[in-house]
């Protein structure tokens, strides 16, 4: 009986492989399906479940010389091959070289391979799969990043391809320990969506929804009308109308979770941050788009990627200009840090996968095995560090100002400043003018002011107050004349000059996204005095 590599031909101490696998079967309970997330409907068991929950298998790919020559000339064009795993044999399996700029290797080197099982033989499956990938993991020496990150997405409610490890041989040449991933195909869609008849797009390399993305599954030939409609929604100038249309076309909750996890795992090369490494599914029954993660072999490497950041992908950039959705994004990160992205949740799964990996490291050359173990320990440490960093970022993040139910807030805790920033000389309380009156005297040309920083969500606002002047001489000024209100970076209309009794003041402004603003109550002039009633300072959302 043979199991794994041919016991007579493999030099990696393969004679111990059956014993290791049997031990692993007892340890893990091979064949158990993935645990069902609380609050969701249990899915039916699938023929592929044992591939990802059972023992690590070996695969031998045999390609005829003529087909090898074809892959040397056209590595992305599938050729027929024979695939073996244990006593199982599959003929006419489509095989091609895969990989992006950093991971592509030639067929004669350490190639990453895509196996289209039914490419040349309709209906054929390998362990229940139509399509699978054998990744060389040249950018992830731990062979763990993709598997662990995909598990995070699935537990958070975002579909992601399952992964496991595999020992791979090509034409009798041992390639070593690979990461095996299920492919994005019809089978994947059927397992994860109620309606699997929609269009599944491959984002390709640095391509966005304004382009004709490659169709992996769906309506043939593609007309990209659904992508064009999504792009058109993102270009709507009016923020309210844009939000309404995106809410109809995008699975809002899953997109917020997807984006949060992209940042939490420091996925600098995914869709939100770089318009790369993603799939996009248009589910017809719901008529909504769902973004799916891909290419997660370089995670947790950016020493504290900030969560408060801008985004490059068209949908992400427009989506998170909306203040409510941006606030929901931060809240989702905070929520995930309590129930999914925690060391108590991640590390047991990580350690179980590590233990599963250990079952086959005995079959790998000693130096290579030790290198893998060191990389696994390093990745584990980076995950712990990232969890701590995220908690610190959430704790230290400035919170948007909370307005009262009527959309207003009384403004207090002002800081005084004069034109040269020396602590507000010429500014003082004046009890004779009122219990909370502030007086600003201009003994020489200047612009004394009161200032207050607030973080505000998108919207239209009116900054209100009350002021008076005496003998205020104020010539024309680029930012405003006399006594008045404004926010930093904006110009106000002329204010009070000369001598004036108490008058209401106001300044209106609009924010397109959540923004930190500096409110300013100022006196600009050559000489004279001005007063502000600090009890009257108020901000109202229009």
Which residue ranges define each predicted feature?
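Bacterial N-terminal signal peptides
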Residues: 16-28
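Extracellular and organelle-lumenal recognition/adhesion modules and their flexible linkers in secreted
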Residues: 397-542
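Phosphate/dinucleotide-binding and metal-coordinating scaffold of catalytic cores
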Residues: 30-404
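Residue-level detector of intrinsically disordered/flexible regions characterized by low predicted structural confidence
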Residues: 4, 17, 30, 419-420
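N-terminal secretory signal peptides that target proteins for export/translocation
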Residues: 1-13
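Residues that act as N-cap/strand-start positions at coil-to-secondary-structure junctions
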Residues: 2, 75-77, 160-162, 274, ...
């Amino acid at each position: 009986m043979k199991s794994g590599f041919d016991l007579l031909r493999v030099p990696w101490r393969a004679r111990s492989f059956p014993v290791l696998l049997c031990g692993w079967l007892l340890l893990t309970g091979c064949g158990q399906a993935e645990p069902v997330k609380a609050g969701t409907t249990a899915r039916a068991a699938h023929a592929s479940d044992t591939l990802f929950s059972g023992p690590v298998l070996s695969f031998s790919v045999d390609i005829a010389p003529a087909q090898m020559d074809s892959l040397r000339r056209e590595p992305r064009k599938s050729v027929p091959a024979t695939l073996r795993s244990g006593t199982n044999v599959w003929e006419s399996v489509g095989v091609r070289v895969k990989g992006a700029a950093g991971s592509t290797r030639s067929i004669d080197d350490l190639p990453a391979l895509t196996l289209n099982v039914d490419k040349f033989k309709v209906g054929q499956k390998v362990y229940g799969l139509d399509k699978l990938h054998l990744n060389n993991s040249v950018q992830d020496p731990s062979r763990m990043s993709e598997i662990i990150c995909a598990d995070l997405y699935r537990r958070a409610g975002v579909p992601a391809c399952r992964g496991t490890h595999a020992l791979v041989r090509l034409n009798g040449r041992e390639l070593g320990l690979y990461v095996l991933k299920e492919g994005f195909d019809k089978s994947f869609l059927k397992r994860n969506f109620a309606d699997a008849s929609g269009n599944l797009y491959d984002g390709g390399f640095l391509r966005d929804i304004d382009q004709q993305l490659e169709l992996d599954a769906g309506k043939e030939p593609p007309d990209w009308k659904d992508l064009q409609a999504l792009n058109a929604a993102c270009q709507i100038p009016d923020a309210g109308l844009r939000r309404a249309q995106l809410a109809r076309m995008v699975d809002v909750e899953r997109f917020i979770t997807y984006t949060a996890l992209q940042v939490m795992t420091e996925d600098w090369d995914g869709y939100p941050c770089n318009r790369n490494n993603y799939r996009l599914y248009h589910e017809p029954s719901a008529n909504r788009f769902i973004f799916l993660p891909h290419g997660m072999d370089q995670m947790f490497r950016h020493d504290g990627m900030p969560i408060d950041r801008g985004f490059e992908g068209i949908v992400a950039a427009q989506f998170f200009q909306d203040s409510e959705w941006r606030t929901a994004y931060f809240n989702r990160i905070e929520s995930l840090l309590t129930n999914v992205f925690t060391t108590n949740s991640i590390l047991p799964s990580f350690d179980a996968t590590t233990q599963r990996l250990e079952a086959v490291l005995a079959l790998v050359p000693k130096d290579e095995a030790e290198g893998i173990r060191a990389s696994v320990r390093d990745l584990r440490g980076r995950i712990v560090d990232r969890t701590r960093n995220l908690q610190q970022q959430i704790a230290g993040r400035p919170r948007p100002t909370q307005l009262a139910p009527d959309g207003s807030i009384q403004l207090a805790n002002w800081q005084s400043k004069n034109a040269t920033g020396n602590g507000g000389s010429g500014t003082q309380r004046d009890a004779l003018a009122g219990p909370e009156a502030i007086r600003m005297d201009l003994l020489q040309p200047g612009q004394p002011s009161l200032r207050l920083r607030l973080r505000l969500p998108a919207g239209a606002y009116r900054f209100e107050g009350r002021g008076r002047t005496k003998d205020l001489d104020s010539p024309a000024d680029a930012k405003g004349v006399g006594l008045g209100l404004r926010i930093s970076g904006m110009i106000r209309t002329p204010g009070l000059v000369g001598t004036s009794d108490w008058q209401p003041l106001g300044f209106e402004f609009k924010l397109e996204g959540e923004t930190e603003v500096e409110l300013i109550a100022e006196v600009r002039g050559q000489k004279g005095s001005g007063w502000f009633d600090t009890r009257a300072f108020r901000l109202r959302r229009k």
